[in-house]
UniProtKB/Swiss-Prot annotation:
Family annotation (PANTHER family): 4-HYDROXY-2-OXOGLUTARATE ALDOLASE, MITOCHONDRIAL, DIHYDRODIPICOLINATE SYNTHASE
Classification via SUPFAM superfamilies: Aldolase (SSF51569)
Domain of life: Bacteria
CDD domains membership: DHDPS (cd00950)
GO MF term (any one): 4-hydroxy-tetrahydrodipicolinate synthase activity
One of the Pfam families matching this protein, by short name: DHDPS
Keyword check for Lyase: yes
EC number: 4.3.3.7
Binding-site positions, pyruvate: 49, 208
Name of the featured protein: 4-hydroxy-tetrahydrodipicolinate synthase
GO cellular component: cytosol
């Protein structure tokens, strides 16, 4: 029997801002309550969807503290805490642990394009610097290079608190290798809402989701249906929401999902540069789908 710590429906939480660009902590608390009431399993602030590249260390720590306070004991808080400088990544990981995070999501170093041994040493040093679980985040589309399956598996076997991977490579050969060869208690999560159904069919453990910001009950329902073996139910959910999953990436994440949340009355539509609002034509396309789904 597996005892995987990371599983189910996790939301990659947006960071709401006021018009002056400061963090809207009142809206942040509302979002966390929204997920608590929806039954979301894990809330993950300060990731890509949370615009972490434009947050200061101090802002990230305060966001994590507020999210932990609002989540209480009903949801795990796994905070984004990654950087392409290993020393900085260690600092962020320690800050997240101190702020109350129960786990961290550590992105693969970007821009540097390290070797596989470099990836291994980076994640080893980060994991050994904290006492909480570490989730590796492999997202070649943003980082510019791939952490190979064997490197991830080596980390999973060698380092006790490396407990999961958010695998967003879209490489199903790599995904199957991770699922088939992993240690028993190591979780494999997808980072792609549109791939939830096939990913779970292969034996995946869940999703770290963008769409859960808008439709947390839907995402949890799809994951739970797949876990229970209710394939037809999961297919029906996927069929209904597949276009929304795709339109959330009609422009760079998190711009579309934040626009949607603003239409839903949950946050103001404010981004930090270099992110800017969507083109009007794309706004119209996304709004039409939200209206079709009765979300606005």
């Amino acid at each position: 029997m597996s005892n995987r710590l990371i599983s189910g429906s996790a939301v990659a939480l947006v960071t709401p801002f006021h018009q002056d660009g400061s963090i809207d902590f009142e809206a942040m608390r509302r979002l966390v309550r929204f997920h608590r009431e929806a039954g979301t399993d894990i809330v993950l602030p300060c990731g890509t969807t949370g615009e972490s590249p434009t947050l200061t260390n101090e802002e990230e720590a305060e966001i994590i503290r507020v999210v932990c306070e609002e989540a209480g004991e009903s949801m795990m808080v796994a905070a984004g805490a990654g950087n392409n400088d290993t020393r900085h990544a260690i600092e962020l990981a320690r800050n997240a642990e101190k702020a109350g995070a129960q786990a961290i999501l550590s992105v693969a170093p970007y821009y540097n394009k390290p070797s596989q041994e470099g990836y291994y040493q980076h994640f080893r040093h980060v994991a050994e610097a904290v006492s909480i679980p570490v989730i590796i985040y492999n997202v070649p589309g943003r980082t510019g290079s791939n952490v190979n399956a064997q490197t991830i598996l080596r980390l999973a076997r060698d380092i006790e608190n490396v407990v999961a991977v958010k695998e967003a490579s879209d490489n199903f050969e790599q995904i199957m290798t991770l699922i088939d060869e992993r240690p028993e208690n190591f979780s494999v999560m997808t980072g792609e809402d549109g791939l939830m159904l096939p990913f779970m069919a292969l034996g995946g453990d869940g999703v770290i989701s963008v769409a859960a910001n808008q439709v947390p009950k839907v995402v949890k329902g799809l994951i739970d249906a797949m876990k229970a073996g209710n394939l037809e139910e999961a297919r029906a959910i996927n069929r209904k929401y597949r276009k929304l999953f795709r339109l959330n990436f009609i422009e760079s994440n998190p711009v579309p999902v934040k626009y949607a949340l603003s239409l839903m009355g949950m946050i103001e539509e404010v981004y930090r540069l270099p992110l800017v609002p969507m083109a009007d034509a794309n706004k119209a396309i996304l709004r039409a789908e939200l209206e079709k789904l009765s979300l606005v």
